[in-house]
């Protein structure tokens, strides 16, 4: 969720502030992953992150690592995080963009005219108004991520499994249904707690998803 926020906030800001010609092109790039299935995108990450994949080839080419000491980026939690961040990133960008688009640019100009530096105007005037989008995007990404199954199962291997994969294992393999039910309860409790925290901090009535 934090990685999606760190990558999605600048992307949404560019979408909201760039000229229409460039923002439309960037929006197409954001929506492009939705034109392919989740399974295809996950399988593509397997090819990209494997030891003989594109990422390791580039790292060897620029001299960060040697050919004999390639990074292990797949079948572990690293691969799961990278693939899930890519898949979930649009769900963070779109709520943020919908909020940022409604913020008048005159607010920043007024802050600058009153003596605020660009950084201070952004932190004190612009960023607080984007909190509903941050909360909505974070809640959406968290709910989607906590129940993800396909991506960790294919990319994560044994060391990159999430709670949904553990529930499936105990339901289908070990037949420890009581543990699976307990894990499901933890899953539900986590979602409800985040929903409660969002309602207390921001207010569910202020949620803006689009």
Predicted regions and their residues:
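Membrane-interfacial helix termini and adjacent extracytoplasmic/periplasmic loops
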Residues: 42-85, 119, 155-159
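C-terminal transmembrane helix and the adjacent membrane-cytosol boundary/short C-terminal tail
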Residues: 97-108, 112, 181-210
